[in-house]
From Swiss-Prot:
One of its GO terms (biological process) is tRNA wobble position uridine thiolation. It is found in: Cytoplasm. Part of a sulfur-relay system required for 2-thiolation of 5-methylaminomethyl-2-thiouridine (mnm(5)s(2)U) at tRNA wobble positions. Belongs to the DsrH/TusB family. Keywords: Cytoplasm, tRNA processing. NCBIfam families: PRK13510.1, sulf_tusB_dsrH. Heterohexamer, formed by a dimer of trimers. The hexameric TusBCD complex contains 2 copies each of TusB, TusC and TusD. The TusBCD complex interacts with TusE. It comes from Pectobacterium parmentieri. Disulfide bonds: none annotated. This is Protein TusB. Its main location: cytoplasm. The keyword Cytoplasm applies.
Length: 95
């Protein structure tokens, strides 16, 4: 399944999201959701400890001036790669 987080992780039910992901699922952080990928934060550590493949939409990190602060343990992707993930994961859950 493809999960997307588009709101700030401080305004999302992160605990429920983490309980909902299964091994092999993908999570794309976009819009204000990219805040969750900030290096050194508690949120990124919780996400990395889960079984989910973690992706961050690069144009959204660039728009917020955060690209250099994003954890090295996530994959920065562009729109084409995001579309490819939607093809690979026909089921989607938006958070």
């Amino acid at each position: 399944m493809l999960h997307t987080l588009s709101s700030s992780p401080y305004h999302a039910d992160l605990d429920t999201l983490l309980r909902s992901v299964d091994e092999g699922d993908a999570l794309v952080l976009l819009q204000d959701g990219v805040i969750a990928a900030l290096a050194g934060g508690d949120i990124i550590h919780r996400l990395l400890a889960s079984a989910v493949f973690l992706y961050v939409l690069r144009p959204d990190t660039e728009a917020r001036g955060m690209t250099e602060q994003i954890s090295n343990n996530v994959a920065l992707i562009d729109y084409n790669e995001f579309v490819q993930l939607t093809v690979e994961h026909p089921q989607q859950l938006a958070w």
